[in-house]
Regions:
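The feature marks the mature, well-folded catalytic cores of soluble enzymes
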Residues: 1-239
Length: 239
């Protein structure tokens, strides 16, 4: 199943329509169900323009969310309410997916944006947690029985500019934004040696790649990839 997300980011409004159409049609030809969430109008009243520390600035007038506001683990989906996904978006997904046998959960761990440098499932029963945002007290209940790797020691590297200036990465934790290839293999930023050593303790093999410019301008490896073709059956991992 493919769901086109109703992004709250005006600059990305036509992204799915124009950049990814060929990919979506290929998935459709391969048998995927293709759905589109209601397109938001993104009027000014969708946003709070004043400075409100640690609170989401995206309001709840229309359905809005980005794909990385969701962590999917088999039948269970965890939705992060933040600046890139609101509660109305969660309600829409819940009404759509729960009749199909999925279970929807929501969290409000931090307000900034996406979720894929915060909670990173590595394999059934093992999850990487950003310990600067997630603690044993606020850890989502669906991961209660899972083993957890608590980590926030990312190597922060920005990009040098032509005038010898410096542009920091989009997040100090973007190094945790990795792609899980299988239950024992991840692709991650080659600078993240502390994270590689930690993953090795759990039998996770790391494939390091250079990805600095993307991490400065847009996002990490998980941000820049989307695994549409998957093998296996729909299972429950959080019972």
């Amino acid at each position: 199943m493919l769901i086109e997300t109703p992004t709250p980011v005006r600059a990305r409004y036509f992204e799915a329509k124009h950049l990814y159409r060929d990919i979506m049609y290929q998935a459709f030809e391969d048998g995927a169900l293709w759905l589109e969430a209601p397109k938001p109008r993104l009027h000014d009243d969708m946003y709070t323009f004043e400075d409100i520390e640690n609170k989401a600035t995206l309001l709840d007038h229309e359905i809005c969310f980005d794909a990385p506001n969701i962590v999917r683990v088999g039948r269970d989906l965890l939705y992060q309410v933040s600046n890139s996904g609101n509660m109305k978006g969660f309600k829409w997904l819940k009404r759509l997916l729960e009749p199909m046998g999925y279970r929807l959960h929501y969290s409000e761990l931090y307000s900034f944006a996406h979720f894929d440098s915060t909670i990173v499932p590595l394999r059934p029963g093992l999850v990487l947690m950003n310990s600067s945002r997630v603690t044993p007290d606020n850890c989502p209940e669906m991961f209660a029985k899972w083993d957890k790797i608590w980590f926030d020691d990312c190597v922060v590297q920005g990009s040098k500019l032509a005038d010898e200036g410096y542009m920091p990465p989009c997040s100090p934790y973007i190094g945790m934004n990795l792609l899980s290839v299988d239950e024992n293999t991840v692709v991650l930023d080659s600078a993240q040696e502390p994270l590689m050593r930690e993953l090795d303790k759990y039998g996770i093999n790391s494939v390091p790649v250079q990805f600095r410019h993307s991490m400065t301008l847009s996002g990490g490896i998980h941000c820049a990839t989307l695994d549409l073709r998957r093998k296996g059956t729909l299972e429950s991992y959080c019972d």
